[in-house]
From Swiss-Prot:
Purpose of the protein: This is the catalytic component of the active enzyme, which catalyzes the hydrolysis of ATP coupled with the exchange of sodium and potassium ions across the plasma membrane. This action creates the electrochemical gradient of sodium and potassium ions, providing the energy for active transport of various nutrients.
Pfam (any one): Cation_ATPase
Region (Disordered): 1-24
Full protein name: Sodium/potassium-transporting ATPase subunit alpha-3
Molecular-function annotations in GO: amyloid-beta binding; ATP binding; ATP hydrolysis activity; metal ion binding; P-type sodium:potassium-exchanging transporter activity; protein-folding chaperone binding; steroid hormone binding
Main location: membrane
Ranges in the topological domain labelled Extracellular: 99-121, 299-310, 783-792, 857-908, 961-975
Topology in membrane: Multi-pass membrane protein
Length: 1013
C-alpha cells in the first residue's frame, strides 16, 4: 500500500521539480572553467592536455553521462492534436447540442408511435459540422512542425579528438567531458570547450549571443562572464577560421545550447487571447441557453405539460441557442486573414496567432537583421581632416562623397589590398551589394564599398601583386600586406596596414593630407582623436589605415620578406584615414516604429550587441525618439556624474546585460513602468526570457522577434513569437507562431493592422450571426406558451444557420477598417472582450426582437389568408398536431384535414425563413460598421454584396425548387409574402443609423455605454 501512496504524490513533486529546473535554467550560465588555469581544468576532468583521455576512461564517462546529444522533448501525438481540434473550445458546445438531439429523438422514439425525425437529422448535422470544421483547422495547423527537429540538425556529425596521444575521428555523440578536441575553420563545435591553444581562431557566436562579428578565441580568460570570455567555445556554434584545441567541459543537455533547448521546450505557454475570448463567448452563450431552457422547462411544467414533453422543449431551446455556423465562420475568417498576411510576407503558423498580433501592446525586437539589414556597411570615412558620409541605403540612393581626392585614392587602395575577402565566383551580373563574399563581415563591407566607389578590386589586386602578409591577431591588432605597385616607373614595394585606429596611429609619423605627406603633429592627433570618438559614439566599428613605400635601396626587387621574424620596418608609416562600419537600419523600419508608437505599442530593443551600437541604432530607427535622453545623456549635458541624475528624469534608458543580471523582479518592473523607450544591450538568452516575463507581469501582450537559437525561449514564452524567415535559425522558426518571410520589422506592423482588423470584423460577424438566434428561438417559445402551431421548424433553422447566414457572415471578414485602426491604443484583454454584454444586448434584445416581429407578421398573414385569424390560433396546438383530427374548423367554419393543415404550417415555416433572410439583409448592412454611418463606409466590399445576393438566391431556390416540399418541407410562396418583412428590414436600418449618429455626436454618452460593442 505504501508504494501506491508515493505514486500519488509524485506528479506534484515532478511539477515542483520541473518548475525549479526551469528557474535554474533562467539563471545565468554558471561556469568557472574559464577562470581556471589549463592545469586546473585538466585536473578537474582527470585528463592530460597533450595525451587526452585513455580509451577506457572515455568509455567509462560515456556510460556515466550518456551520449553528447540533446534530449528530444515530449511531443504531442498527432491524434491528440486532432482531438483537440474536435473537442476544443467551441466544438464542445455543438457536441452537447448533438448529444441532446439524439437524446430527445430517443425519448420521442420510445414514447410516440410515429416520431418526427427532426431531432435525429439535427444531431447528425451538428456532429458533421464539428467534424468538418475540426478537420479543416487540424489541416491548417498540421502545416507547422515541431520545435526540436531543427535542434537535431545542429549536432555536428564528426569530431576530431585526441585520445592516448593519437588523433582520431569519432562520432560527435561519443565525445565526453575531459576529451581533448581540435577544431578548424568550417567545423561545428562538438561540445562546450575550454580553449588551451589557438591560432587565428574565430567563431561565429551570432546564433547564441546575437553578435554579428566573428569572435576571436584564445586561451586567456578575458571576461568574468563565460559567454563573453575568449577561452570558451560553445556547442553547435561554427568555427569560421583558424584552428584551436580545447578540453570538453560540458556535453549534450548540459551545454549552453542544450540549456536553451531545454528551456524552450519546457516553457509553459498560455492560451492565445482569441482562445480566451472564444471561451468567454461560449460561457456567455451557454449561460443564455441554459437560462432560457430551464425557465421554459419550469414554465411548461406549470402550464401542465408532461415531464417528457418538458424535457423535449428544454432540449429544443438549448439547441436553438447554439449558433451552428459560427465555428466554421470564425475558422474561415482567421484562415482568410492568415492568407492575406502571407501575401504581405507574414506566415502565420497557428491560426489563433493571427489575432494575437492585433492585441499586442509591447514588441521586444532583436536588433541584428530585424531592425537592421544584417550586413556590415561602410558608413563614414575620415580623410583630409574631415568626416565623409558613405551611402548605407539598400538601393544606393543616399549621399555620395568627393572621390577625386588623392587621399581617397590611397585609402581605397589600402582598403582593397589589405583585405582577404573575395567575391564568390559567378556573380558578375548580380548587383554588388547582393553578392556573396567569402570573408569576415568587416572585410566584406570594405570590399563592397571599394568595388562600388573605385571599380573592380580584383583588377586592383592583380595589378598590385601581394608578396607578403601578416594576418590580424589579437596581440598586435593589425593586418599588414606588402605589394608590388602598378606604376612601371616606380620599383618600390608598397606596405599597407589596417587595424585598431589607436594602434595604427602609434606606428605613424606622417599623415596624408590632400595627397601630400605632412608631419603628424599634436594638432592632427587631436583631430584624429575627435573623429575617432565621434564615429565610435555613433556605434560604428572604426578601422585605421596607413601605408608606406619601402625604400628601393633597402628592399630591392625580389627581396625575401620574412613575416615570422619581421625583417622590414613597421614604424614611421604614413597615416591615411579612418573608415567606420555599421549594420545599418532597414529603410522601412523608422516608419514602422513610428506607426507602432501611434498605435500605442511600446517597442523595446533587446540585443546581444554593444550598448553604444544598440543605442545608435535605437536612435536611428526611432526606438529612442529625438529629444528623449537617457541618464548618461543628461549627465553629459549637465556635466555631472551619472549617479547624481534622477532616473525619473530620463524617458529613455539603455540597460546593460551585466546590470540586468543583478536586478530583482521589482527593479525590472520599475524600469518597464517608468521608461517609455528601453534598450537592453549585451543580453543573454535567459535575460530575454526574463524581460518577456517582466512585460507580461505588467499585463502586456508581448510579441517577440528574433532569429537566433538564443531567441527561442523568449519566442516560445511570448504571446506571439515572430521569427525571421531568411536569417532565422530553424530553431527560432519552430518556436515562433509567425515567420516574417522578408525579415523586415515593417511586416510586423502590417501584421498588427491585420490582427486588429480581424478582431473588429469577428465582432461584426458574431453580432450578425447571433441576431438571427432570436427569430429562431421565439417561435418555439410562443409554441410552448400560447399553444399555437409551430411557426418555424428545426430543419428551417439549420437552413438559416448553415445555409443563408454563412456567406454573409464570412463576407464581413473582408470589410475594410472603419477609422485608422493604427491610431488607437491596443485593446485591453481584461476589458475589451470579443463578445461583451453590450453585443448580446444589441443582437438579442434590440435588432433580434425587430427581426422576430417581422417573422411573426408573415406567419400571421399567411394563416389569416388561409382562414385562421390570430385570435383563433391560441390554444389550438393539441388539435392541430393530432393525426386523428381531420375536421378542424378555421375562423370561417371551413374544415381542415391533418394533411392540409400541415401544408399550411410548412408554408408558414418557409415564409418565416424568408422573412429572416429579408431582415438579415439590413442586419448585414448595419454590421458593416460599429460607429460610422454606412454612407461614410460605402459598399466597397464586393464579397458582402455577393453575400446579399447569395442568401436571397438560396432562399428562393429552397422555396421554389421542385421536390423541396418532400426533402426539407419547404413550400413555394406567393410573391406578395416576400414583402411582409420589408418594413421591418427598413426599420432595423433606420434604427441603427440613428443609434450610430447619437454615438458619433455624444462620444462616451449613455448610448455608447449601453450599445457600443
Amino acid at each position: 500500500m505504501g508504494d501506491k501512496k508515493d505514486d500519488k504524490d509524485s506528479p506534484k513533486k515532478n511539477k515542483g521539480k520541473e518548475r525549479r529546473d526551469l528557474d535554474d535554467l533562467k539563471k545565468e550560465v554558471a561556469m568557472t572553467e574559464h577562470k581556471m588555469s589549463v592545469e586546473e581544468v585538466c585536473r578537474k576532468y582527470n585528463t592530460d592536455c597533450v595525451q587526452g583521455l585513455t580509451h577506457s576512461k572515455a568509455q567509462e564517462i560515456l556510460a556515466r553521462d550518456g551520449p553528447n546529444a540533446l534530449t528530444p522533448p515530449p511531443t504531442t501525438p498527432e491524434w491528440v492534436k486532432f482531438c483537440r481540434q474536435l473537442f476544443g473550445g467551441f466544438s464542445i458546445l455543438l457536441w452537447i447540442g448533438a448529444i441532446l438531439c439524439f437524446l430527445a429523438y430517443g425519448i420521442q422514439a420510445g414514447t410516440e408511435d410515429d416520431p418526427s425525425g427532426d431531432n435525429l437529422y439535427l444531431g447528425i448535422v451538428l456532429a458533421a459540422v464539428v467534424i468538418i470544421t475540426g478537420c479543416f483547422s487540424y489541416y491548417q495547423e498540421a502545416k507547422s512542425s515541431k520545435i526540436m527537429e531543427s535542434f537535431k540538425n545542429m549536432v555536428p556529425q564528426q569530431a576530431l579528438v585526441i585520445r592516448e596521444g593519437e588523433k582520431m575521428q569519432v562520432n560527435a555523440e561519443e565525445v565526453v567531458v575531459g576529451d581533448l578536441v581540435e577544431i578548424k575553420g568550417g567545423d561545428r563545435v562538438p561540445a562546450d570547450l575550454r580553449i588551451i591553444s589557438a591560432h587565428g581562431c574565430k567563431v561565429d557566436n551570432s546564433s547564441l549571443t546575437g553578435e554579428s562579428e566573428p569572435q576571436t578565441r584564445s586561451p586567456d580568460c578575458t571576461h568574468d562572464n563565460p559567454l563573453e570570455t575568449r577561452n570558451i567555445t560553445f556547442f553547435s556554434t561554427n568555427c569560421v577560421e583558424g584552428t584551436a584545441r580545447g578540453v570538453v567541459v560540458a556535453t549534450g543537455d548540459r551545454t549552453v545550447m542544450g540549456r536553451i533547448a531545454t528551456l524552450a521546450s519546457g516553457l509553459e505557454v498560455g492560451k492565445t487571447p482569441i482562445a480566451i475570448e472564444i471561451e468567454h463567448f461560449i460561457q456567455l452563450i451557454t449561460g443564455v441557453a441554459v437560462f432560457l431552457g430551464v425557465s421554459f422547462f419550469i414554465l411548461s411544467l406549470i402550464l401542465g405539460y408532461t415531464w417528457l414533453e418538458a424535457v423535449i422543449f428544454l432540449i429544443g431551446i438549448i439547441v436553438a441557442n447554439v449558433p451552428e455556423g459560427l465555428l466554421a465562420t470564425v475558422t474561415v475568417c482567421l484562415t482568410l486573414t492568415a492568407k492575406r498576411m502571407a501575401r504581405k510576407n507574414c506566415l502565420v503558423k497557428n491560426l489563433e496567432a493571427v489575432e494575437t498580433l492585433g492585441s499586442t501592446s509591447t514588441i521586444c525586437s532583436d536588433k541584428t537583421g530585424t531592425l537592421t539589414q544584417n550586413r556590415m556597411t561602410v558608413a563614414h570615412m575620415w580623410f583630409d581632416n574631415q568626416i565623409h558620409e558613405a551611402d548605407t541605403t539598400e538601393d544606393q540612393s543616399g549621399t555620395s562623397f568627393d572621390k577625386s581626392s588623392h587621399t581617397w585614392v590611397a585609402l581605397s587602395h589600402i582598403a582593397g589590398l589589405c583585405n582577404r575577402a573575395v567575391f564568390k565566383g559567378g556573380q558578375d551580373n548580380i548587383p554588388v551589394l547582393k553578392r556573396d563574399v567569402a570573408g569576415d563581415a568587416s572585410e566584406s563591407a570594405l570590399l563592397k564599398c571599394i568595388e562600388l566607389s573605385s571599380g573592380s578590386v580584383k583588377l586592383m589586386r592583380e595589378r598590385n601583386k601581394k608578396v607578403a602578409e601578416i594576418p590580424f591577431n589579437s596581440t598586435n591588432k593589425y593586418q599588414l600586406s606588402i605589394h608590388e605597385t602598378e606604376d612601371p616607373n616606380d620599383n618600390r614595394y608598397l606596405l599597407v596596414m589596417k587595424g585598431a585606429p589607436e594602434r595604427i596611429l602609434d606606428r605613424c609619423s606622417t599623415i596624408l593630407l590632400q595627397g601630400k605627406e605632412q608631419p603628424l603633429d599634436e594638432e592632427m592627433k587631436e583631430a584624429f582623436q575627435n573623429a575617432y570618438l565621434e564615429l565610435g559614439g555613433l556605434g560604428e566599428r572604426v578601422l585605421g589605415f596607413c601605408h608606406y613605400y619601402l625604400p628601393e635601396e633597402q628592399f630591392p626587387k625580389g627581396f625575401a620578406f620574412d613575416c615570422d621574424d619581421v625583417n622590414f620596418t613597421t614604424d614611421n608609416l604614413c597615416f591615411v584615414g579612418l573608415m567606420s562600419m555599421i549594420d545599418p537600419p532597414r529603410a522601412a523600419v523608422p516608419d514602422a516604429v513610428g506607426k507602432c508608437r501611434s498605435a500605442g505599442i511600446k517597442v523595446i530593443m533587446v540585443t546581444g550587441d554593444h550598448p553604444i551600437t544598440a543605442k545608435a541604432i535605437a536612435k536611428g530607427v526611432g526606438i529612442i525618439s529625438e529629444g528623449n535622453e537617457t541618464v548618461e545623456d543628461i549627465a553629459a549635458r549637465l556635466n555631472i556624474p551619472v549617479s547624481q541624475v534622477n532616473p525619473r528624469d530620463a524617458k529613455a534608458c539603455v540597460i546593460h546585460g551585466t546590470d540586468l543580471k543583478d536586478f530583482t523582479s521589482e527593479q525590472i518592473d520599475e524600469i518597464l513602468q517608468n521608461h517609455t523607450e528601453i534598450v537592453f544591450a549585451r543580453t543573454s538568452p535567459q535575460q530575454k526570457l526574463i524581460i518577456v516575463e517582466g512585460c507580461q507581469r505588467q499585463g502586456a501582450i508581448v510579441a517577440v522577434t528574433g532569429d537566433g537559437v538564443n531567441d527561442s525561449p523568449a519566442l516560445k514564452k511570448a504571446d506571439i513569437g515572430v521569427a525571421m524567415g531568411i536569417a532565422g535559425s530553424d530553431v527560432s522558426k519552430q518556436a515562433a507562431d509567425m515567420i516574417l518571410l522578408d525579415d523586415n520589422f515593417a511586416s510586423i506592423v502590417t501584421g498588427v493592422e491585420e490582427g486588429r482588423l480581424i478582431f473588429d470584423n469577428l465582432k461584426k460577424s458574431i453580432a450578425y450571426t447571433l441576431t438571427s438566434n432570436i427569430p429562431e428561438i421565439t417561435p418555439f417559445l410562443l409554441f410552448i406558451m400560447a399553444n399555437i402551431p409551430l411557426p418555424l421548424g428545426t430543419i428551417t433553422i439549420l437552413c438559416i444557420d448553415l445555409g443563408t447566414d454563412m456567406v454573409p457572415a464570412i463576407s464581413l471578414a473582408y470589410e475594410a477598417a472603419e477609422s485608422d485602426i493604427m491610431k488607437r491604443q491596443p485593446r485591453n484583454p481584461r476589458t475589451d472582450k470579443l463578445v461583451n454584454e453590450r453585443l448580446i444586448s444589441m443582437a438579442y434584445g434590440q435588432i433580434g426582437m425587430i427581426q422576430a416581429l417581422g417573422g411573426f407578421f408573415s406567419y400571421f398573414v399567411i394563416l389569416a389568408e388561409n382562414g385562421f385569424l390570430p385570435g383563433n390560433l391560441v390554444g389550438i396546438r393539441l388539435n392541430w398536431d393530432d393525426r386523428t383530427v381531420n375536421d378542424l374548423e378555421d375562423s370561417y367554419g371551413q374544415q381542415w384535414t391533418y394533411e392540409q393543415r400541415k401544408v399550411v404550417e410548412f408554408t408558414c415555416h418557409t415564409a418565416f425563413f424568408v422573412s429572416i433572410v429579408v431582415v438579415q439583409w439590413a442586419d448585414l448592412i448595419i454590421c458593416k460598421t460599429r460607429r460610422n454611418s454606412v454612407f461614410q463606409q460605402g459598399m466597397k466590399n464586393k464579397i458582402l454584396i455577393f453575400g446579399l445576393f447569395e442568401e436571397t438566391a438560396l432562399a428562393a431556390f429552397l422555396s421554389y425548387c421542385p421536390g423541396m416540399d418532400v426533402a426539407l418541407r419547404m413550400y413555394p410562396l406567393k410573391p406578395s409574402w416576400w414583402f411582409c418583412a420589408f418594413p421591418y428590414s427598413f426599420l432595423i436600418f433606420v434604427y441603427d443609423e440613428i443609434r450610430k449618429l447619437i454615438l458619433r455626436r455624444n462620444p462616451g454618452g449613455w448610448v455608447e455605454k449601453e450599445t457600443y460593442y
